[in-house]
Each structure stands twice: as structure tokens, then as C-alpha cells.
Amino acid sequence: MTNNLDKLKIGNKSFNSRLMLGTGKYRTTQSAIASIEDSNCDIVTVAIRRLPVNLKNDNINFLNKLDWNKLWLLPNTAGSQTAEEAIRMAFLGHELACQVGQEDNFFVKLEVISDPKYLLPDPIGTLKAAEFLIRKGFTVLPYINADPMLALHLEDLGCATVMPLASPIGSGQGLNNLANIKIIIENASVPVIIDAGIGTPSEATQAMELGADGVLLNTAVAQSKNPSQMASAMRLGVQAGRLAYLAGRMEKKYYADASSPLEQISKLI
């Protein structure tokens, strides 16, 4: 287990879990709820465009079945093709947070994606929307390409995190942008959350071993054969990677180094 003092701090909030879970693509509502529970995540992200205007009038929506005293809602602006659309979505997201009893929740996962084929985030639109939302008091978590300079610009604007993609969203290709992600982690003064492209627990572990502060997953869990079980596996993968990062990797050596040196044995004789 990680140290209780080793919390993920985003804005003015602290979280025990470094795994965030999305809510799309699940085969059933029950599967989504079970996966969230088994992941032990603290943050759940929800696409605003998929939700009704008023949750109180929707007894079917699974968000009404989650315990929002234990979970923190992260509305996301998925589907926004322009900065203006993302800004509107962000304000709707705050209204949703209020409906689940989180009036002080101004978090938003900012996604501006104008490319319908490859679903790569729009850096210009993201910068524009982030600047406006920060001025309005939002805690902005921007989804970006693994671009070290863009990450720095967003941090300078006041973003609470940066969220570089590991590989294209929903692809399960893993950490394809390893070199740039390392640079982002090295340069960042805000938490770095790896978002999109991770397909296995070992890839989540690798991301955390690099020094990432957290991982956000959706498709890898929702589209697995057993989402609840995969959610548990991802939880353990993130925990293992974080522990390994804190413990510190052994130094790589060119030559072999015996684990039972002869000089130590001679002292016992």
C-alpha cells in the first residue's frame, strides 16, 4: 500500500487514488458501477453531452446510483470541436456537479477535438478555452498531445494538471509517446495524468514508474471481457507503478553483479 501522505493533489483537492475512471462504452450500467467500485478510484469522469439536463428527472441514469459523498465528479467536454463549445460544456458540467451535491466542484477535463478521424486534441482551441475557463474560476485539466511546450504553456496559464495522451484515444496502443511524456513529467510543476491509449495494467504501471502522477482509463476497462476484474487489475497496476517510482529503480549496469558476493561468504567462514 502507498503511504497515506502520498496523495494526489489537484487544485485545492486531495485524492487517495491515482487512478481515474471514465464512464463510457460499458455494456451495461451494472458493469460500469461495479468497475468504478472495484477500481477504488476517487475521480470519475463523465461526458456532459451524453447526459440529460436534469438528473433529478432521470431515474434511469446510472449517475444517480453512485455515492457522490465518496466520489469526485470530473465533467469532460468530449465532443467539443471548438473552444466555444468546450466552454459551454464546462459550465453545464458545473451545473451537473451541483446536481450531485458538489456545489464547490469547478473541475473540468478540457477536451477540444476538431479532428473527427484521429481524435487528436486541438492545441490552439485547448489553449483558448483553458485561458477563459481559468479566468472564470474553473480547475482545468486539459487533454493534450504529448507536446512538452504545449504542456508548459498550459501550466503557465494556470491549469491544475496536464493530461498528455499515451497514444490515440481508444486505441489501446500503450505508451507510444514515451520520450515526450518523459520530458513533460520532468518539466512539469503540476500533476501529469496519462490519458488515452493505455490498454493493459502493465502499461499503467509503466506510466507510473516514469513518474506520472496518475492515469485516466476508460476503454481498457469498459471493453475488456470482464470490466470489473480489469478495473481491479488497473488499480493494482497503478499502485505498483507508484510504489516502484517512490522506491527508486536500481542502477543499470553493463556487467553482471552477483547477488551473493564471495567476499561476503568468506566473512562468515
From Swiss-Prot:
Q: Which domain of life is it from?
A: Eukaryota
Keywords (A to Z) from UniProt: Chloroplast, Plastid, Schiff base, Thiamine biosynthesis, Transferase
UniProt main location, coarse: plastid
Q: Where in the cell is it found?
A: Plastid, Chloroplast
Output the SUPFAM superfamilies linked to this UniProt entry.
Answer: ThiG-like
Task: Give the pathway.
Answer: Cofactor biosynthesis; thiamine diphosphate biosynthesis
Give me the residues that bind 1-deoxy-D-xylulose 5-phosphate, please. 170, 196-197, 218-219
Gene3D superfamilies in the cross-refs = Aldolase class I (3.20.20.70)
- Which EC class does it fall in? transferase
Gene Ontology cellular component terms for the protein in this record: chloroplast
Describe its assembly: Homotetramer. Forms heterodimers with either ThiH or ThiS.
Protein name as annotated? Thiazole synthase
